[in-house]
């Protein structure tokens, strides 16, 4: 038997349109958000499976739509036209008329289940039959033409049934680090990058790396300046529809994501996930310099600036620099005018609500932050952090003049004033 070249084997694969999921308007409206998210995962995974076969597949419009956060394509089931397919199209890499072991490749069973549709948004890629001929007919040895006609109507109903089966199947892929479960291995792989810190998708413009391809796609729009999704209330524009949806909840006040522990609600799922780490004590983001761990990646990023000494956020009014944008915002309110937030107990005013909240703990005596070593309690987390350095011996603040180290920032500032009085820079 003659060897089959990789090119020939590639030609025997199915097209993307064969595995695309199609819903009608009515079917789509019945799906809840988590099912719609799964739909996107299934579509993107099927597309990536076709691409992984080595075929020169152009990116269909529906995939482009999904990456931008648009609704998927939907078609009307009425007036569907007939479409003819060969009775046996090989989905395997070998030149065999059929797949003998359906359990061999799970994706192959799904692909075969999806035959019989055509989408106006998916360009038609060429399908080759096992005998190498291209088209919708397969000649039998006697020369008879055998055809299998499936209406798109039937194909869509078949696909919809399969989609609902996928949407209701159990999650069987479990993360060994945190125990979270997923429907498929690719979703698990993407999730595990949050633990490993892997970022395989690099931006060619600025070099910034991302853990997900969709995040890179959204980021690329920042270079092009394209912000196609505009808020109808305040006209603020966004790169993708999902960001616009989250933003609009600020105007509506909708907070659909609620914490089961304390009942606090949030605008988006990621904020809820970060919040829940307060209850679980999970701190997955560790500093490689000092080993300190944090519950949020943004807090780790700000912390690492302490080691580098870089303060990227500078006040345009006075030139003072800060580690975080929130600190800069609080500072700039001092330039803007009178403080807005006043304490009802003593009348002291503050520029932001968080500072007022911290201050009010003085009156209430609330000290929620307790040292695990000695039991001493504090009204502010930062004071607990400074106190814990007494036990650990950590001194992260270094004098740039003499190299002496200190456990608190205020101590190094006080120390450096001595040099300022002596005229030493």
Curated annotation (Swiss-Prot):
SMART domains: KRAB, ZnF_C2H2. Its main location: nucleus. Residues 93-110, 144-154 have a biased composition (Basic and acidic residues). A zinc finger (C2H2-type) spans 173-195, 201-223, 229-251, 257-279, 285-307, 313-335, 341-363, 369-391, 397-419. Coiled coil: none annotated. The keyword Nucleotide-binding does not apply. Keywords: DNA-binding, Metal-binding, Nucleus, Repeat, Transcription, Transcription regulation, Zinc, Zinc-finger. GO terms for cellular component: nucleus. It is found in: Nucleus. Residues 86-110, 122-163 are annotated as: Disordered. The keyword DNA-binding applies. GO terms for molecular function: DNA binding; zinc ion binding. Belongs to the krueppel C2H2-type zinc-finger protein family. This is Zinc finger protein 2. It comes from Homo sapiens.
